[in-house]
Amino acid sequence: MTRPNYMIREYPLQQGALEIGYIEEYFSEFPNKKSASEIMQRLDGRDYQILMAEAPLLDDSAVVPVSYKVSHELRAEESDPKLADLVRRLKDTLDFDNQRILYNWLGATRLDWRGRGHFRALTEEQEVWAVTNGYGEIVVKTKNRYYDMRGTLDSLQFNVIKLETSADPLDSKVYLSKRLGPLVLDAHRSRRQVTRV
């Protein structure tokens, strides 16, 4: 039995921002969807990667976007107030001085496509890109309420590095990271076909 071949597109900034703005409409669990202009503003002037997995419908009538990831470099000194706050929160747990940090800002899989390996394929492609571009660690933030995402990150060998509790435990913030290197890439399991748009 051969493993699935995941179709992934890697986008440049403007087109990728539009595509992500479109696919986020499928995610009712996310109250604060990002607009294309927000995405472009955040990523402009920094290293970034925009990935989207696509899959054919059961009747092969069309190919649809099913999962996405948007990541960017996270610098020790950030001028954007939200990113500066993130760095401040993570200074004690991440080594910003001796390695490049990649922040997995946005990412999800459509509910009806979960459990089929698309997010794993995107993560593995992200890790290849990160290692190739000199990153030593990937960090991601989620909320306690997103059990599926936390479980997925656990299966992808991300480690919890910080927990910020909230009055409502579901709103507690969970920070996870994964150190990168050749052994991480050797453990990849997905067969991916990547198209750079």
Protein language model regions, located:
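Short amphipathic alpha-helix that is part of the acyltransferase structural core
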Residues: 1-66, 70, 196
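Short hydrophobic/aromatic beta-strand element in the GNAT-like acyltransferase core
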Residues: 47-52, 68, 101, 106, ...
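Conserved acyl-donor/pantetheine-binding loop and adjacent beta-alpha core of acyl/acetyltransferases
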Residues: 59-106, 167
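Conserved GNAT acetyl-CoA-binding A-motif
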Residues: 101-102, 130-143
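Conserved acetyl-CoA-binding loop-helix of GNAT-fold acetyltransferases
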Residues: 109, 115-128
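Conserved beta-strand-loop-alpha-helix junction that forms the acyl-donor binding cleft
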Residues: 109, 140-150, 167-169
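Conserved active-site alpha-helix within GNAT-family acetyltransferase domains
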Residues: 120, 132, 144-163
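C-terminal "cap" of GNAT-fold acetyltransferases
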Residues: 165-197
